[in-house]
Amino acid sequence: MKYVVVSGGVISGIGKGVLASSTGMLLKTLGLKVTSIKIDPYMNLDAGTMSPLEHGECFVLNDGGETDLDLGNYERYLGVTLTKDHNITTGKVYSHVMAKERKGDYLGKTVQVVPHLTNAIQDWLERVARIPVDDSGMEPDVCIIELGGTVGDIESAPFVEALRQFQFRVGRDNFALIHVSLVPVIHGEQKTKPTQAAIKDLRSLGLTPDMIACRCSEELDKPTIEKIAMFCHVGPEQVVNVHDVASTYHVPLLLLEQRMIDYLGQRLKLSDIKLGAEDKERGARLLDRWRHLTTAIDESFEVVQIALVGKYTHLKDSYLSVIKALEHSSMRCKRKLEIVWVEASDLEPEMSASDKEKFQQAWKSLSSSDGILVPGGFGTRGTEGMILAAKWARENKIPYLGVCLGLQVATIEFARHVLGIADATSSEFYPEVAEDKQVVVYMPEIDKQNMGGTMRLGLRPTIFQEDTDWSIIRKLYGSASSVEERHRHRYEINPKMVQKLEEHGLKFVGRDETGTRCEILELVDHPYYVATQYHPEYMSKVLDPSQPFLGLVAAAANILPSLLAAERAVGARADF
């Protein structure tokens, strides 16, 4: 097993996740099997109870793990399926060590950070790195380990020490370190001092970088590269220029041009790993498809505007998987994506009284967009604005996709304005509302006391109902009888309301195995009005877009019929 560690210095949020994912993708183009682990040095057990505005989105895995958003990057770039154990947090490791102490596994010894915690971290890395993550079912060849935060922070100290020990545990030929640093441009001059200081801190902790990935707003000058190499005690070929590009999907090719994989191949002796001809051919095909993808991005000029009506729009990372799913779909449709951010509460009548200009701008943005997306969320704030957005899409035949909460507000809107239930709402918004007004109800099996890990989580099947051959979303799924998607919710459509809703044209074309829990709704006689209780964005891949999102973008671009025809003729992974 080969290990490539990606750490960061100077500042957080520097792009370690994209660089780690891109490195893994390039290793896959050699035919290698690649996995990934993310270390998050916070005390939370997982990301499930953290505010999206605090930490970005919570990414959900097949096994129901609520993890850091970087695991989404790994899955999208590498085409793998990770587990909750691929996300290590300080809280998880401490819980693991304390559980062993309570069982007496340490035989009465004083339990300390070194060696007990650091050994637990190393054991975790070795165990999880060997878990098969792709369709081959075989143990991976290479594991990418991303250390979150910034080296030198007190929170990451135990993990840095564990990695220092780990390099000797696995051997030099099996361990490489890429350190990501910032090269700011001040008054037109590229400054190397922050990188020099970051590498000095790293070396003082016992870790030596094999490569330094320099993030900069512009391409690094040759003298800058030579200066970093000289003062950081590495060769110029070990300094990688990761400047800003038009799209993050260009980053793997940017690294390839600088022969990063050639260096890692020599450093880790990757040629010793025995690969079959089929593995190498698969890797070559992956690289060809990626080149084709980036070319399609550069040649996409026709714009499609999607209004994203959310309640966490002040931090775009709150909707990272949604953004990526839209990007994947727009690339398939050969369109240039423009996301129009609309804060849901700005659409509500109360905003007209408090800030008329903001209210008018929100409605102008919504009404001028080609398609409308209402993503997931929790709580009451902004939900009336989402309901109004769903109403606008329904009445004006604008392509609409609702996800999780987006399905619930679409159903409430339909109940209010088509069924005539004026006070229709959700028991999440108004717990004391009369039962005949509850369009959305709390799922009976869900724990109401504890918040962490108590939702309906992970990969679950959705069964398409009889007489749904007309359904656009079913056609997008290749007319399948069932699909499996990832869930994260506590509330569901009230089963007692379903018959009346369907009688008026709101069809629940997909349900769970019992046939009672509604998973997909679709409006009859509408260009594209679809909503899902599950989160399809979590399974969207760069080269294999999520079907509900693909339908939204294609409908918004007025190419849905031709897309469906192409998908039927060539297959779901065809380059349309």
Swiss-Prot record:
Keywords, ordered alphabetically: ATP-binding, Glutamine amidotransferase, Ligase, Nucleotide-binding, Pyrimidine biosynthesis
Catalytic activity: UTP + L-glutamine + ATP + H2O = CTP + L-glutamate + ADP + phosphate + 2 H(+)
Biological process annotations from GO: 'de novo' CTP biosynthetic process; CTP biosynthetic process; pyrimidine nucleobase biosynthetic process
Protein name: CTP synthase
PANTHER family (alphabetical): CTP SYNTHASE (PTHR11550), CTP SYNTHASE-RELATED (PTHR11550:SF0)
E.C. number: 6.3.4.2
Source taxonomy: Eukaryota, Fungi, Dikarya, Ascomycota, Saccharomycotina
Native species: Eremothecium gossypii (strain ATCC 10895 / CBS 109.51 / FGSC 9923 / NRRL Y-1056) (Yeast)
Pathway linked to the protein: Pyrimidine metabolism; CTP biosynthesis via de novo pathway; CTP from UDP: step 2/2
Function of the protein: Catalyzes the ATP-dependent amination of UTP to CTP with either L-glutamine or ammonia as the source of nitrogen.
Pfam families xref list: CTP_synth_N, GATase
Annotated catalytic residues: 404 (for gatase activity), 535 (for gatase activity), 537 (for gatase activity)
Residue ranges constituting the Glutamine amidotransferase type-1 domain according to the UniProt record: 305-559
One term under GO cellular component: cytoophidium
SUPFAM superfamilies on file: Class I glutamine amidotransferase-like, P-loop containing nucleoside triphosphate hydrolases
Gene3D superfamilies: 3.40.50.880, P-loop containing nucleotide triphosphate hydrolases
Family label: Belongs to the CTP synthase family.
GO MF annotations in UniProt: ATP binding; CTP synthase activity; identical protein binding
